[in-house]
Amino acid sequence: MKIYNFHGKKNIVGPRIREARSRQQLSQADLAAKMQLEGVVIEQNCISRLEIGTRFVPDYELPIYAKVLHVSVEWLLGMTNE
């Protein structure tokens, strides 16, 4: 499978995930633990790579990030400001 870059990044949601995580005062390890409780196997280092854009984000993870961070998928994708 070929993974493409968009403006040098492997995802567009990383900054929004970092913003939502920081607003809730969650560490990267806390977010990884919440994702694991929802059935996504992910570690703190993967969250770090995701936030800086060096990790591809599978589509099935987006609704789970939205759920645990209490935001919409549209917001994560930068389609809305709220």
Predicted regions mapped to residue ranges:
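DNA major-groove recognition helix of helix-turn-helix/homeodomain DNA-binding modules
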Residues: T54, P58-W75
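DNA major-groove recognition helix of helix-turn-helix
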Residues: M35, E51, E61, T80
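A short, Lys/Arg-rich alpha-helix, primarily the initiator
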Residues: M1-Q24
